[in-house]
Curated annotation (Swiss-Prot):
This is Bis(5'-nucleosyl)-tetraphosphatase, symmetrical. PANTHER family: BIS(5'-NUCLEOSYL)-TETRAPHOSPHATASE [SYMMETRICAL], METALLOPHOSPHOESTERASE. The gene is apaH. Keywords: Hydrolase. GO terms for molecular function: bis(5'-nucleosyl)-tetraphosphatase (symmetrical) activity; phosphatase activity. GO terms for cellular component: cytoplasm. Pfam families: Metallophos. InterPro entries: Ap4A_hydrolase, ApaH, Calcineurin-like_PHP_ApaH, Metallo-depent_PP-like. It comes from Shewanella baltica (strain OS195). SUPFAM superfamilies: Metallo-dependent phosphatases. Transmembrane segments: none annotated. It is an enzyme of class 3 (hydrolase).
């Protein structure tokens, strides 16, 4: 059995299939773990989502910001932009089933036997494993409720929840968790989330900002952290226990697959349009 972890697919289904062929992926024996953002921007979000649904227990994904955005669009809480490239999936006959499937996916997953944690954007350095589990579970619980659109999705878009406050309750607590696990890149020196800078660290001009993974963290010491979201890193973080897998396929770069057992990365360049 092999565990394969794939970066942000974002509808780049053909590239995903090329990658899986390279490693002879077999869902009857292997598992495919995705760091989230299965959909948006790329040409084939519908096929990507249907493929993951078809894999059953052989597929493990976490929610990314674009997956949550799809829920908001389906619930008519936001207007789609042309760059979302989600018209086909929103008009598909199985869109409700796809949304229901996404609602069952968590914000973080663990592989305890390998001391590994996967989330879309990373893990706040202030959080212990226990806090991470608790906060992610609160969001998962809210997503599974009948009123998830009104109680959570309609209120999740806010930059106000930028600082971790263990005494926060209700939507503010859920917002911080969503912001941290699906949107985080840089933190201010006081631990606040920054939502603006997307550049790689060498190009960041604000001395008050540091990448989240450069802060001291108990989980950074004890676990391998697998994440995506930050395409500008191009997988370069300089730490063998950090696996940054978003390598910008939807922007014309490549899709990255990491074979856990071999600690090997396999890449597939963005395919040219035929």
């Amino acid at each position: 059995m092999a565990h394969y972890f794939v970066g942000d697919i974002q509808g780049c289904f053909a590239e995903l299939q090329k990658l899986l062929a390279k490693v002879d992926f077999n869902p009857s024996r292997d598992e495919l773990w995705a760091v989230g953002d299965l959909v948006a921007r790329g040409p084939d979000s519908l096929a990507t989502l249907r493929f993951f649904r078809s894999l059953g227990d052989s597929a493990k994904t976490v929610l990314g910001n674009h997956d949550l955005h799809l829920m908001a669009l389906h619930g008519k809480l936001k207007r789609a932009k042309p760059s979302d490239n989600l018209t086909e999936i929103l008009e598909s006959p199985d869109i409700s089933a796809s949304i229901d499937w996404l609602r069952q996916q968590p914000l973080m997953r663990e592989l305890p036997e390998h001391q590994l944690i996967m989330s879309h954007a990373g893990v706040p350095p202030q959080w212990s494993l226990e806090v991470l589990r608790e906060e992610a579970a609160l969001v998962s619980c809210a997503l599974k409720q009948d009123d998830y659109l009104e109680a959570l999705i309609s209120q999740m878009y806010s930059d106000s929840a930028e600082q971790w406050d263990p005494s926060a309750i209700g939507i503010e607590r859920l917002r911080y968790c969503i912001n941290a696990l699906t949107r985080m890149r840089y933190l201010y020196v006081d631990g606040r989330l920054d939502f603006d800078c997307k550049q790689p660290p060498e190009n960041c001009t604000n001395p008050q900002l540091k990448p989240w993974f450069e802060f001291a963290s108990p989980l950074r010491q004890s676990h391998t952290l697998v994440f995506g979201h930050w395409a500008a890193l191009m997988g370069n973080v300089g730490d063998s226990k950090l696996k940054a897998l978003d390598t910008g396929c939807c922007w014309g770069e490549h899709l990255t697959l990491w074979h856990l057992e071999k600690d090997q990365k396999i890449t597939q360049k963005k395919l040219k349009k035929s």
